[in-house]
Structure formats: structure tokens, C-alpha cells
Curated annotation (Swiss-Prot):
GO CC annotations, alphabetized: glutamyl-tRNA(Gln) amidotransferase complex
Protein name (Swiss-Prot/TrEMBL): Glutamyl-tRNA(Gln) amidotransferase subunit A
Gene for this chain: gatA
Catalytic activity of the protein: L-glutamyl-tRNA(Gln) + L-glutamine + ATP + H2O = L-glutaminyl-tRNA(Gln) + L-glutamate + ADP + phosphate + H(+)
Group of enzyme by EC: ligase
NCBIfam families assigned: gatA
Length: 497
């Protein structure tokens, strides 16, 4: 199977180039940022009716930003960043002053933020035109982008299948040539999992290294904003733009940004000599799709052939990660989403003068939230209630500590860990949406990193032999050493060419 949208289906070669290539053309004035941005806007108009990657397209604002870059470059000014002039798709969980921010929920339909998220501001300052806001599972709760109040996104590799979630819109935009760069958020795999299903690259940075200010929260101790693109280098270039300490984010860490771009360039030589790669036993076993395991084993052997030392690693508490995650996350959701009550912003239902404030709040939340969001609010409220807090929430937090300790011990033995990103390739739309447990199981490989606050990357690892659909290799690194992801990821990417 091939992705007809990215290669054969493109009407402009500008939409098939990497972000680094586009930046080189723009900065050398061989092409303008307006031409590149317009090509991608045309591409969105051409194919997004089928893909539905975008919830909002800001053509006027994107072209104005592109014109500003062109004007500065024509005046002899240095580019504002390595990606100045290259357009980008932004997940609709990050607030913007010039476009609606809905988090794909009816309760925020039409909401206009009075301020930009820190990541949004950094993108603007870097001269990166924002093409629009991408579709997602409502409030980032889901693994297929089917939970969006505005319709599902489709996978460019097979329109009957999911692009993953919660950030399927961003990855589908990349895979269909609608954008060369995108921003996602990752609570339990929402960047990495869609990247695996769409043959793109996605990174969850170390918790606290990219600002969450202006991110509509799902679970505050798990959420992390991150970059996604079609190559490791492009992802590194975007990572460097958005990372850094932010005084407006209480969870932001005041540490130097890891040298991710330098690491990606270093790894491009394909040499993995001296790198110890740990294969996590808990993620290499029966129950995963045969084609996914075959691709994973082939990836491990490729890394061995590139000089890496392969070490089997045991992380016993990973088996309990799914249960712990789906207790901690709903508890944080029930707290975070209490603010959406119809009183201050967003939807307000039944406010006809005959109902009390409590009745208006109840009706607003009943009409404004979708089924999965309601399910998690109820679960979280129950787990936090008197008599159950110690038995459920505190126990889950203890398991979280044990998982972090497993990672610490593992990284004493190896430089990075690897696993499949997902247990299977993309499933058909509708297959899991009525079975929450099946949907939750799709996050098995990715969510332990979020519980521990560490960094991870998914990058293409070949097509599955049984479905012909993309698979992803997940690389995991210690906290604040995100550059290891890029060094190893770029080398692996080079070895596949």
C-alpha cells in the first residue's frame, strides 16, 4: 500500500519537500514564503474535504505572516529562525488570538482566546506562518480522532482507517502534504501514536521543557506539547523553536534546551557504534499484530547492523501502567474540566431565565461534552471521592513511582530504550469507538513515558507485511536528554534509506 496523497496526488512539488529544504529555498530567495504557504493552502483546499485534518484554516493570517517574512528577507535581514517562512499546522488545543480554539468540543465552539499560548507566540516570533488549527479527539481524550465533535479525521494511507489520536489531524496534515510541520500535544501518546500510523515523525519532549501555557489542559501532570514532521531533522528544527523555560508555566523547568538539531545532524551519518539500545521485554510479546512485531524486530536488527549494542531490558511495572494511567488521567480531567460550566465562556445551554445557575451548568455540560469526556469525568470524580481516594488514586500514584524507577534502572544499563509505538497498524474507523477498553489498550506502548515525564520519539519503521500500513519505532530517552532521541533517530532514519 502507498500514500497516494503525498507523492502521486500532489499538484505542487513544494508540498512534498521537507521543511529544511523549503527553508533553504526561502532563505536563498529561490522561492518566497508566500509561494510555499499558498501551495499548502491550495493543497488543503484540494484534499481536506476527504481527510478532514483541519477544523479551521486561516488563509489571510497565514499569507500575512508569509509576506512579513518575505519583506524582512528582501530587506537583507537575517531569518528570524531556521524555519522562518515555512508554514505549520497547529493542534486545536493551543489558544490563538486570531482563530477559534475549540479543543474539538462543542462546549468551546467559536471560542476566541484573548491571548496566544506561549508556543503560538514562539512560532509567530520565529516567522512560521500558521496554516490553521487541526482536528483532535475532544479535549485530547481518545486514540482515533473519532471523539471530535466536528467529525473524524481520515488516514491518508487508507481513508477508511484512523490516523490515530488524539492528534490525528496534525499527523494527517503532514501525511497528505497539507503541511510540512505540525504541533501536537501528548498526554499518553497523542503525538507518537498518530505519527506511527501515518508514517511521520513525532516527539514527546521531556515534561516541563516546552511550555504548557495556553494549552487547554486534559491532565496537567501528563500533557506535553511537542513537534511533529516528516523527517527527524525537521522535527528537531521545530523542537528547538518551541522549547525553553517559560515564567508563565509553573511546571516549566529552567534548564538549557537540549542540542536536538546538532544531535540530528550528527546522527545523519548512520553510525550507532557505542550506543547501547535496550529492548523492553514488556513491549515485545504475543498479542501484538504480527506485522508490527516483524517490523520492530527488523528495526532492532538494523540498529545492530549500524553498530548498536542490543540489550534486553526488563521493566516489570510497565504491565500495570495502563491501569494506573486510566486512574490518574480521569482524576485530573474531572478537576480541569470543572471550569467549563457555561458561566464564563463557551456554550451556555438553557439560559432562558427560568432555570437556576446549577440547572444551566448541568444542561451546558450535558450538551457540551461528548460521551468519552463524560465517561472520564465520571470515573475521575468517583476515584477522588471520599472512601475511594486512597484505594484508587493514591495506589495509582504509587504505581507511577514504580514505573519511573523502572526507567531509572533501565537507563543505568542503556542509552535509549526501543519498542513498537503501537500494538497494531491503523484500525478501521468505527472498529473500537464503542469499546473503550479496546481503545485504551492502543496506548499500551506510549503512556509509560508520560507517567514518568520522560522523552520519546516515534519514527517510521517500514510497512507491516500483513496490512501494508505504516509502523512506528518508539525511541525513549532519559529526562532532559532529548538529544539522544534525535541522534539515534536520525541514524536509524539514515539506515533505512
Amino acid at each position: 500500500m502507498s500514500n497516494k496523497y503525498l507523492v502521486e496526488g500532489s499538484t505542487s512539488e513544494l508540498t512534498t519537500k521537507t521543511a529544511a529544504e523549503l527553508a533553504g529555498l526561502i532563505h536563498s530567495r529561490e522561492v518566497t514564503s508566500r509561494e510555499v504557504t499558498q501551495a499548502h493552502l491550495d493543497r488543503i483546499n484540494e484534499v481536506d474535504g476527504e481527510i478532514h485534518a483541519f477544523l479551521h484554516v486561516g488563509e489571510e493570517a497565514a499569507l500575512a505572516a508569509a509576506d512579513a517574512v518575505d519583506k524582512a528577507l528582501d530587506a537583507g535581514e537575517a531569518p528570524a529562525s531556521a524555519l522562518a517562512g515555512v508554514p505549520l499546522a497547529l493542534k486545536d488545543a493551543l489558544v490563538t488570538t486570531d482563530a477559534p480554539t475549540t479543543a474539538a468540543s462543542k462546549i468551546l465552539e467559536g471560542y476566541m482566546s484573548p491571548y496566544d499560548a506561549t508556543v503560538t507566540r514562539k512560532l509567530r516570533e520565529a516567522g512560521i506562518p500558521i496554516l490553521g488549527k487541526t482536528n483532535m479527539d475532544e479535549f485530547a481524550m481518545g486514540s482515533s480522532t473519532e471523539n471530535s465533535a466536528y467529525g473524524a479525521t481520515r488516514n491518508p494511507w487508507d481513508l477508511e482507517r484512523t490516523p490515530g489520536g488524539s492528534g490525528g489531524g496534525s499527523s494527517a496534515a503532514l501525511a497528505s502534504g497539507e503541511a510540512p510541520l505540525a504541533i501536537g500535544t501528548d498526554t499518553g501518546g497523542s503525538i507518537r501514536q498518530p505519527a506511527a500510523l501515518t508514517n511521520t515523525v513525532g516527539v514527546k519532549p521531556t515534561y516541563g521543557t516546552v511550555s504548557r501555557y495556553g494549552l487547554i489542559a486534559c491532565a496537567s501532570s501528563l500533557d506535553q506539547v511537542g513537534p511533529t514532521a516528516r523527517t527527524v531533522l525537521d522535527t528537531a528544527l521545530l523542537h528547538e523553536v518551541i522549547a525553553g523555560h517559560d515564567m508563565f508555566d509553573a511546571t516549566s523547568v529552567d534548564k538549557p534546551v537540549a542540542p536536538v538539531v546538532a544531535a540530528a545532524r550528527e546522527g545523519a551519518n548512520g553510525d550507532l557504534k557505542g550506543v547501547r539500545v535496550g529492548v523492553v521485554n514488556q513491549f515485545d510479546r504475543e498479542g501484538y499484530q504480527d506485522g508490527v512485531l516483524e517490523a520492530f524486530h527488523a528495526s532492532v536488527e538494523q540498529m545492530r547492523s549500524q553498530g548498536a549494542e542490543i540489550v534486553e531490558v526488563d521493566c516489570p511495572h510497565f504491565d500495570d501502567a495502563l491501569g494506573a494511567y486510566y486512574l490518574i488521567l480521569p482524576c485530573e480531567v474531572s478537576s480541569n474540566l470543572a471550569r467549563f460550566d457555561g458561566m464564563r465562556y463557551g456554550l451556555r445551554s438553557g439560559d432562558d431565565g427560568t432555570r437556576s445557575a446549577d440547572e444551566v451548568m448541568a444542561l451546558t455540560r450535558a450538551e457540551g461534552f461528548g460521551p468519552e469526556v463524560k465517561r472520564r469525568i465520571i470515573l475521575g470524580t468517583y476515584a477522588l471521592s471520599v472512601g475511594y481516594y486512597d484505594a484508587y488514586y493514591l495506589q495509582a500514584q504509587r504505581v507511577r513511582t514504580l514505573i519511573a524507577q523502572d526507567f531509572t534502572r533501565a537507563f543505568e544499563q542503556v542509552d535509549v530504550l526501543v519498542s513498537p509505538t503501537t500494538p497494531s497498524t491503523a484500525f478501521k474507523l468505527g472498529d473500537k469507538i464503542t469499546d473503550p477498553l479496546e481503545m485504551y489498550n492502543f496506548d499500551l506502548c506510549t503512556l509509560p513515558l508520560n507517567l514518568a515525564g520522560l522523552s520519546g520519539m516515534s519514527l517510521p519503521s517500514g510497512l507491516a507485511s500483513d496490512t501494508g500500513l505504516p509502523t512506528g519505532l518508539q525511541i525513549m530517552a532519559p529526562a532532559f536528554q532529548d538529544d539522544r532521541l534525535y541522534r539515534v533517530g536520525a541514524a536509524f532514519e539514515a539506515g533505512r534509506k
